[in-house]
């Protein structure tokens, strides 16, 4: 009860800021789009539209970014040819640069997760060493809860590798991170040092980035892993200013949970227009925001004809659904049983599959909404394959490229890279594996 009350209080507080900032944001930004106008002013604690001016010209959904196709080096990974979709998106939203490397602020990261594109943006700011120290000065005093990125605002640096790492936290279950964490924990105390964390970050980030690239588009080579020459937000958050602290898995798990909660609360506020509840139409808009399937018009027809006006979804229901979306691979395996048996997926079967995949249940309110939206034939059955595609696009913010890689193959790659990382750690420590 206390936790729920706290969440409601946070939503109410941010909702108040959002509503007070709407007038300011609408005056400052010319034609920002219905969702950008709703949040750009106050939901990000003073993210005024003066922050937006021209720099990058971006096509909305076709991926034609004006990022030059060239050789790119980012903390040890060399990209040859056209950058990946995630790299393009990172360049679109990043606002800081130091010695040829681009960085996001915490506010940039939140915008990149919430919005499809940045319509107007200031010029990239070139940082000196003194600027970097000033930018990172607020991290030590910032709270470590579910408002961490909002509280920091522009006071922080996020590298491309860290950007990929944070996105993976939003789209994958915690279990895989725990496995990779333990693989790099050579002492068995569930604590890792800074250099080991870099390897964990590289392992996860590399796999996620490769999954957003079509094999005939981009060539990748991996250079020797090297530590960044400057501190970043995550480094100082986990290891302190001098990098001498150790990171315990429990602390890292709390960070993952808080990050997921923060993004969920931000997106809830964005699509509920700052209210403490989300209309079912708003939920459908959130669900279909990054979708370009040929059946999108049918989905919206279902929303208009099948969802009753005045019905809403609570923040807790929304969070439960977001938790479910981090287990899509496991859920897809459960759905394959119905495909192989040529059986339609009805509400009871869907509810059971969710419980098996996540260990939790979705409310009947959410399930009823999902079924009404994705019932293409009017037979009260779910078109689950396209439903999964819509959800994957939603969670990957429109950058998902369909793969033939299963979750087992994904974590097999992670395990392989983890073993390589372990060998390097032991080699540096002057120890043998056995």
Swiss-Prot record:
Belongs to the MICU1 family. MICU2 subfamily. It is found in: Mitochondrion intermembrane space; Mitochondrion inner membrane. Changing residue 172 to A: Does not affect interaction with MICU1. It comes from the Eukaryota. One of its GO terms (cellular component) is mitochondrion. Residues 172-207, 227-262, 293-328, 362-397 form the EF-hand domain. It comes from Homo sapiens. The keyword Cell membrane does not apply. Calcium sensor of the mitochondrial calcium uniporter (MCU) channel, which senses calcium level via its EF-hand domains. MICU1 and MICU2 form a disulfide-linked heterodimer that stimulates and inhibits MCU activity, depending on the concentration of calcium. At low calcium levels, MICU1 occludes the pore of the MCU channel, preventing mitochondrial calcium uptake. One of its GO terms (molecular function) is protein heterodimerization activity. The lineage of its organism: Eukaryota, Metazoa, Chordata, Craniata, Vertebrata. CDD domains: EFh_MICU2. This is Calcium uptake protein 2, mitochondrial. Keywords: Disulfide bond, Membrane, Mitochondrion, Mitochondrion inner membrane, Phosphoprotein, Repeat, Transit peptide. Transmembrane segments: none annotated. The modification Phosphoserine is found at residue 205. Ca(2+) 1 binds at residues 185, 187, 189, 191, 193, 196. Ca(2+) 2 binds at residues 375, 377, 379, 381, 386. The keyword Flavoprotein does not apply. One of its GO terms (biological process) is cellular response to calcium ion. Heterodimer; disulfide-linked; heterodimerizes with MICU1. Component of the uniplex complex, composed of MCU, EMRE/SMDT1, MICU1 and MICU2 in a 4:4:1:1 stoichiometry.
């Amino acid at each position: 009860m206390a936790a729920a009350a706290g969440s409601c209080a946070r939503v109410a507080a941010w909702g108040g800021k959002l509503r007070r900032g709407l007038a300011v944001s609408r005056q400052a930004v010319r034609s920002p789009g219905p969702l950008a106008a709703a949040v750009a002013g106050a939901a990000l604690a003073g993210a005024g539209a003066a922050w937006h001016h021209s720099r990058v010209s971006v096509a909305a959904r076709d991926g034609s970014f004006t990022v030059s196709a060239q050789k790119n080096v980012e903390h040890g990974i060399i990209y040859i040819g056209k950058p990946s979709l995630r790299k393009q998106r990172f360049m679109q939203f990043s606002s800081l640069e130091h010695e040829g490397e681009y960085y996001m602020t915490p506010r940039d990261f939140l915008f990149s997760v919430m919005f499809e594109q940045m319509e107007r943006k200031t010029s990239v700011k070139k940082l000196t060493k003194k600027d970097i120290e000033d930018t990172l000065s607020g991290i030590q005093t910032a709270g470590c809860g579910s408002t961490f990125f909002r509280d920091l605002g522009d006071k922080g640096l996020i590298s491309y590798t860290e950007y990929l790492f944070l996105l993976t936290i939003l789209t994958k279950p915690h279990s895989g991170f725990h496995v990779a964490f333990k693989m790099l924990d050579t002492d068995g105390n569930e604590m890792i040092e800074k250099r080991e964390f870099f390897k964990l970050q590289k392992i996860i980030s590399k796999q996620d980035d490769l999954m957003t690239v079509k094999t005939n588009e981009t060539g990748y080579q991996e250079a020797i892993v090297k530590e960044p020459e400057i501190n970043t937000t995550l480094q100082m958050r986990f290891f302190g200013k001098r990098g001498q602290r150790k990171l315990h898995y429990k602390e890292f798990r709390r960070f993952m949970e808080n990050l997921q909660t923060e993004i969920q609360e931000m997106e809830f506020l964005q699509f509920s227009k700052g209210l403490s509840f989300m209309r079912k139409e708003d939920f459908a808009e959130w669900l279909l925001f990054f979708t370009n399937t040929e059946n999108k018009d049918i989905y919206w027809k279902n929303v208009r004809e099948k969802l009753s006006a005045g019905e809403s979804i609570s923040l807790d229901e929304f969070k439960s659904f977001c938790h479910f979306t981090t287990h899509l691979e496991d859920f897809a395996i459960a759905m394959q049983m119905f495909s192989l048996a040529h059986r339609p997926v009805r509400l009871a079967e869907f509810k059971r599959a969710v419980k098996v995949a996540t260990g939790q249940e979705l409310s009947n309110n959410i399930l009823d909404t999902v079924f009404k939206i994705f019932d293409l034939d009017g037979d009260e059955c779910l078109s689950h394959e396209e439903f999964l595609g819509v959800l994957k696009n939603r969670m990957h913010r429109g950058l998902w490229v369909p793969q033939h890689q299963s979750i087992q193959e994904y974590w097999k790659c992670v395990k392989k890279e983890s073993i390589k990382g372990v060998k390097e750690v032991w080699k540096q420590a002057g120890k043998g594996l056995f």
